[in-house]
């Protein structure tokens, strides 16, 4: 655990997958496509805590078009919080249509915009489309329900599943390692 905390101390950025991490991975399908996806407010609170502590966030998904609309709408909501409008938090960046091999390239390019390195980035993913990026970041994480092949190759496996608090588990780890008193953070 000490090794993981040392890695978490260095984190200044977080890249998240969509389905299976932000959302549960379950989709209610309708005649014209997906109708609903589920997520957990604890994860949203974890993201707010990280942003309040100065950590920049990106969502990187292979989905595009109508399938990515759920994630795009959620991030738009998060980016309309008063803390973003007032300039206290950086907006969350969304990358859609990003296939497995391109995720590393996209994350690297995004980090350069902030003058950050892969070593200063954490990422959370749940399946093979996330494997490459998880192998390159400073702190690789997976939700509890991630595929075994992913869990074998990450530094931290959250106790909770994707869409059920896994992001909050990772946020708590990072903030604790960095000695952040979450009771002192401005969350709106």
Where are these regions (language model features)?
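Alpha-helical substrate-recognition element adjacent to the catalytic core
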Residues: 2-101
